[in-house]
Amino acid sequence: MLAKRIIPCLDVKSGIVVKGVQFRNHEIVGGILSLAKRYTQEGADELVFYDIEASSNNRLIKKKWVSQIAEIINIPFCVAGGIQTIQDVQSILSSGADKISINSPAISDPYLISRIADRFGVQCVVVGIDSWFNKEESQYYVYQYTGDNTKTIKTSWKTCDWVQKVQALGAGEIVLNVMNQDGMKNGYDLVQLKKIRKICNVPLIASGGAGDYFHFYDVFNEAKVDGALAASVFHNRIIKINQLKKFLMKKGLEIRVC
């Protein structure tokens, strides 16, 4: 059995790590490098770095940020932000990333997933999916350009359909960002994650809602995800990664020892 992954996330806006609630009202958290170093020292299994404005502004994440982080960490490093071409991927990987994540660009050009997978391998391609639960329709939909709420749009894709589509195109991993839960700290959306787990045959990462130790245990134990991504609880030191891992190990989960 593969060890469950604990993954801190750095959402970056204008060169500073920020965090919002339901993808809105972002507040400054801290510096990119100091947080990256701290999470490595605390025992994170992977680091995810999102330039949340890049796709909305039709630009690529700054390579200098990628290379600076890569120099000070020794864990797998996933990068996202405005990646639209094979050349963009090559540039980011050459700067020190281990894999890339695409979200909004994949919605505009789904076969970008296939082109990247064919060139670099499926293990290099993560697809991020921003999912919002529409109460009126009792349905989950995929949203695009969520890094800027003035440009965010609801797509015609139902989340379950998009999950199946990106797998068919070559996604090697899926990060499901549950927008309703983002920053709320009241737990991951286990209902949606269980549904997605049934149709997801690649590693599935849960994102959005972590607030305490049991939220991590529940998402691993009940939704059977492969990794849990979080930001607020780590940034604000509500939870320290090494202590979280000890808790999960005592609960019987397979966890990489720090």
From Swiss-Prot:
GO terms for molecular function: imidazoleglycerol-phosphate synthase activity; lyase activity. It is found in: Cytoplasm. One of its GO terms (biological process) is L-histidine biosynthetic process. It catalyses: 5-[(5-phospho-1-deoxy-D-ribulos-1-ylimino)methylamino]-1-(5-phospho-beta-D-ribosyl)imidazole-4-carboxamide + L-glutamine = D-erythro-1-(imidazol-4-yl)glycerol 3-phosphate + 5-amino-1-(5-phospho-beta-D-ribosyl)imidazole-4-carboxamide + L-glutamate + H(+). Its EC number is 4.3.2.10. The keyword Cytoplasm applies. Pathway: Amino-acid biosynthesis; L-histidine biosynthesis; L-histidine from 5-phospho-alpha-D-ribose 1-diphosphate: step 5/9. The active site is at D11, D130. Pfam families: His_biosynth. The keyword Cytoplasm applies. GO terms for cellular component: cytoplasm. Its main location: cytoplasm. Keywords: Amino-acid biosynthesis, Cytoplasm, Histidine biosynthesis, Lyase. IGPS catalyzes the conversion of PRFAR and glutamine to IGP, AICAR and glutamate. The HisF subunit catalyzes the cyclization activity that produces IGP and AICAR from PRFAR using the ammonia provided by the HisH subunit. Heterodimer of HisH and HisF. Belongs to the HisA/HisF family. This is Imidazole glycerol phosphate synthase subunit HisF. It comes from Buchnera aphidicola subsp. Baizongia pistaciae (strain Bp). The gene is hisF.
